[in-house]
Amino acid sequence: MQPDRDTLLAGAQALGCPLSDTQADALLAYLGLLQRWNQVYNLTAIRDPKQMLVQHLLDSLAVIAPLNRVAGSAPLRLLDVGSGGGLPGVVIAVLRPDCQITCVDTVAKKATFIRQVTAELRLPQLVARHARVEQLTDGPYSVITARAFASLADLVKLTRPLLAPGGCWMAMKGQHPQAEIDALDADINVFHVEQLSVPGLDAERRLVWMRPRSVASS
């Protein structure tokens, strides 16, 4: 596991979120759980451990520095929509233990897996929900995020009732989603589209930040 640990530590450092030993241990334990469960429950199409580390852990770690910059260091409530195996929700929970994080997915086995992660990694602030996001009533959330979930317009439509006043959406995308941005309602302000560089990943990554225009910065 040492090469994986070195890759993780170096990647996190390059992403501006250096890991403590405890955080690195937790993320590698999570990766091990994901690999074991994936053999039976098909949580992710990626099966190679090294690819999992880059395409799941480092890809999710790439949002930590931007999240800290935009949302600040104060505790917040975050909703991870279509979380799958807990990405990026579990990774954020490890790096931001002060935050209350809810991972929601329509697939029961994925929610069950996240509950197992919560228990084994001792992350009491991480909650898994097996539900459609539009069925949730436990908002509001300061930040709503999604990775490979749906179009920006659908994300906003399904989750807007759950967004706290002054809150924002943080959508993880690949190439610059100009067509999706153009399809948003006029009252949604895309206040930043950030290009991410994930160590070891030869693919484009963008982080799209949105908020209702009524609270957009002038």
Curated annotation (Swiss-Prot):
It comes from the Bacteria. S-adenosyl-L-methionine binds at residues 82, 87, 133-134, 147. Gene3D superfamilies: Vaccinia Virus protein VP39 (3.40.50.150). Disulfide bonds: none annotated. It catalyses: guanosine(527) in 16S rRNA + S-adenosyl-L-methionine = N(7)-methylguanosine(527) in 16S rRNA + S-adenosyl-L-homocysteine. GO terms for molecular function: rRNA (guanine-N7-)-methyltransferase activity. HAMAP family: 16SrRNA_methyltr_G. Belongs to the methyltransferase superfamily. RNA methyltransferase RsmG family. This is Ribosomal RNA small subunit methyltransferase G. It comes from Leptothrix cholodnii (strain ATCC 51168 / LMG 8142 / SP-6) (Leptothrix discophora (strain SP-6)). The lineage of its organism: Bacteria, Pseudomonadati, Pseudomonadota, Betaproteobacteria, Burkholderiales.
